[in-house]
């Protein structure tokens, strides 16, 4: 199993959690506050528990205690950042729920709304709405006073959307999660495209039982993406802007007023021809993670990464095979990298240095075609 190095762990933990007021003010916190206020008004007799845990969590709370199968693909190191055999950087804020449920089981409380916000760590694609360090919010109402089911879930969904995105058209579609029954995905309409903002469901009885809550307890579970909600609320079309240090942008990340675009930096495109093994995982998530790791502190300069084409060894011209020194079973990928920092313009020389870093991270062949 691949485990993070000490340097990689320190780098991950050093990244600012935009949901944490102790690390500075950010509009993401206003989204959380507005949801908390709306649900508190809807459920005046429900206790509110706000939880903020360290991002290094037990593997069991990230997966097992939420009902994930032992062979679930999401457990693999290509998707999860392992700190040790038994600890991970949480891949979702749902990892805070099992300890909260255990605390509830040991308490005298009978109706609680658990609010868990924080940064998460994933391996994800590079595009305008994805990042490897998203911010998520888990909202779980657990009660033995009232029976919570699908009607209450529908009401909770409506209150969430009406609070953060008033007037927005939305829909729900069936979704499967190991920690819910009657699972749903929540989408909102942006222009002519449905954009996912979160998932939810009725809390799965087996998850409650694992925490020591008997069958008198029922619950609702919801996990909206905070970055996505804020971007839709403010009209932001680039997730990297949420962390921008450009004063013209950063000043607008303190409220929920519509975003006013600043002058756009020109994109720099570089097409890469790389060789990969037949067994290589070339999914957008895995390639995106390799790009971010390769660029390090310059990772936010990558606006997008797209595989334009794939050619097998057998389908390549002999001249191309010889030039790349490919062997049977390997593949040639044509990858387009778009570089565009949100706060400055790259020179050609700077772009070429970044291009070569990405090339080295993706290319598995013996011949290096570097620019610098």
List the predicted regions and their residue ranges.
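Long, well-ordered mid-to-C-terminal structural blocks that present hydrophobic/aromatic surfaces
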Residues: 144-145, 149, 162, 229-231, ...
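A carboxyl-terminal module marker
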Residues: 178-372
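Hydrophobic/anchoring residues in structured secondary elements
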Residues: 119, 172, 307-310
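Short secondary-structure junctions
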Residues: 39-46, 108, 161-169, 294-305, ...
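Amphipathic alpha-helical segments
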Residues: 28-43, 139, 152-165, 286-293
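Short, flexible active-site loops
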Residues: 134-144, 267-272
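Extended C-terminal subregions enriched in glycine
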Residues: 149-184
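Class II aminoacyl-tRNA synthetase-like tRNA-binding/catalytic domains
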Residues: 1-130, 136, 141-142, 194-208, ...
């Amino acid at each position: 199993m691949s485990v993070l190095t000490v340097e990689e762990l320190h780098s991950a933990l050093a990244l600012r959690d935009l949901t944490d007021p102790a690390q500075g003010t950010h509009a993401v916190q206003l989204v959380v506050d507005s949801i908390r206020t709306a649900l508190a008004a809807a459920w005046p007799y429900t206790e509110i528990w706000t939880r903020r845990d360290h991002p290094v969590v037990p593997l069991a709370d990230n997966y097992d205690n939420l009902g994930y199968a032992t062979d679930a693909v999401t457990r693999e190191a290509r998707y999860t950042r392992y700190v040790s055999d038994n600890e991970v950087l949480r891949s979702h804020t749902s990892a805070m729920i099992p300890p909260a449920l255990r605390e509830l089981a040991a308490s005298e409380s009978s109706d609680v709304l658990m609010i868990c916000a924080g940064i998460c760590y994933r391996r994800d694609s590079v595009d305008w709405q994805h990042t490897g360090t998203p911010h998520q919010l888990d909202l779980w109402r657990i009660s033995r006073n009232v029976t919570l089911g699908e009607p209450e879930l529908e009401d909770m969904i409506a209150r969430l959307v009406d609070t953060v995105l008033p007037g927005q058209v939305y829909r729900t579609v069936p979704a499967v999660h190991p920690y819910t029954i009657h699972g749903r995905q929540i989408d909102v309409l942006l222009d002519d495209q449905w954009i996912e903002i979160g998932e939810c469901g009725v809390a799965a009885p087996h998850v409650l039982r694992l925490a020591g809550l008997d069958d008198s307890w029922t619950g609702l579970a919801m996990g909206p993406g905070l970055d996505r909600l804020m971007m839709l609320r403010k009209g932001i079309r680039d997730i990297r802007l949420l962390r921008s240090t450009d004063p013209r942008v950063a000043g607008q990340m303190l409220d929920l007023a519509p975003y006013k675009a600043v002058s756009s930096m020109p994109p720099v495109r570089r097409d890469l021809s790389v060789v990969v093994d037949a067994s290589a995982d070339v999914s957008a998530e895995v390639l995106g993670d390799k790009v971010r790791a390769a660029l390090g502190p310059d990772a936010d300069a990558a606006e997008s990464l797209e595989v334009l084409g794939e050619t097998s060894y057998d389908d390549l011209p002999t001249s191309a095979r010889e030039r790349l020194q490919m062997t049977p079973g390997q593949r040639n990928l044509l990858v387009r990298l778009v570089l565009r920092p949100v706060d400055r313009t790259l020179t050609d020389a700077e772009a070429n240095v970044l291009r070569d870093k990405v090339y080295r991270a993706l290319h598995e062949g013996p011949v290096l075609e570097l620019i610098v």
